[in-house]
Curated annotation (Swiss-Prot):
InterPro entries: ESAT-6-like_sf, T7SS_ESAT-6-like. Its main location: secreted. It is found in: Secreted. Belongs to the WXG100 family. CFP-10 subfamily. Keywords: Secreted, Virulence. Elicits strong humoral responses. Induces significant lymphocyte proliferation and up-regulates the induction of TNF-alpha and IL-6 in tuberculosis patients. The gene is esxU. Pfam families: WXG100. This is ESAT-6-like protein EsxU. It comes from Mycobacterium tuberculosis (strain ATCC 25618 / H37Rv).
Amino acid sequence: MSTPNTLNADFDLMRSVAGITDARNEEIRAMLQAFIGRMSGVPPSVWGGLAAARFQDVVDRWNAESTRLYHVLHAIADTIRHNEAALREAGQIHARHIAAAGGDL
């Protein structure tokens, strides 16, 4: 039973969430890159002029945002992994301190 003032963390869950975030991030990136590839492959003979230029602007902005999303999701997964490692280490340090203090009794 844990007390209300204790820190509890499920390290396996943290690692799992980081891995799932990475996997989904790669899936999203692949889908977005496939879409950009299809849109970039539309020949100029299909459409042109101002509409094509504006559409290309939208595609460029969308591509930039999808790249930003990829980097942000990657940073989130890295942060989760870092937090898991830091919390695990802190727990081990605290356990050693408690064991040492108990040995002095």
